[in-house]
Amino acid sequence: MEQADSVTFYGVAMDGRQGISLDNFSVRGSSGLHLRSIPLHTLCDFQRLRPYDLIVVQYGLNVATERGVKYDGYKKGMLSVIEHLKTAFPETSILLVSVGDREYKNENGDLRTMPGVKNLIRYQQSIAADSHIAFWNMYEAMGGQGSIVDMIGQKMANLDYTHINFKGGKHLAGILFETLMYGKEQYERRKAYEEE
């Protein structure tokens, strides 16, 4: 029997055979670029053992900065991440979810949406378009400019003016679910129309 010096675990699955299964590969503070470092053969094993219908990629909030204008390096890296995932999961749909609102205090001490957030979202839209994957703008779903402040007022976000909490996540998940179901309904209508 061979012994290894170390072992890397990506998770343990204890799902039933019915219903929806959700795997979450979260890394706090990650830009998402770490996904490139998962060996392709490991991802292909995931595909073989746990074939996914949908992969949701939602990273990047800590990439946004107060003065962030260009995120070309991030875009290049994320394009390679998406390509890596598409290679391992060729039959799986991929959805890129944008960053949400993030506030900072301007020179007058007023809370404002960090300028880098809007710029990063434009880059994320471009990543999705260039990769031919779906895109969902969480910033707009939150309410756009200054929305994290409103969510804090509704106890749906943390006082760091950056991160939503469980209640906020549940709220946004409901909006995303409705969006996905609407898209599915429209797809089925179009498909039925084309088959007539």
Q: PLM features: residue spans?
A:
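Conserved SGNH/GDSL esterase-like catalytic core that processes O-acyl groups on lipids
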Residues: 1-80, 87, 163
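Hydrophobic/aromatic beta-strand patches that form the interior of the parallel beta-sheet core
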Residues: 23, 95, 134-136
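Active-site beta-loop-alpha junctions enriched in small/polar residues
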Residues: 27, 60, 99-101, 141
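Catalytic His-Asp segment of secreted/periplasmic serine-dependent ester chemistry enzymes
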Residues: 40, 101-196
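Generic hydrophobic alpha-helical scaffold/packing signal
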Residues: 44, 79-86, 125, 173, ...
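Short, conserved beta-strand edge motifs with alternating hydrophobic and charged residues
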Residues: 57, 95-98
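Aromatic/hydrophobic pocket-lining residues that form the small-molecule binding cavity
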Residues: 74, 78, 82, 121, ...
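A short helix->loop->beta-strand "cap" motif at the edges of active sites that frequently abuts
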Residues: 89-94
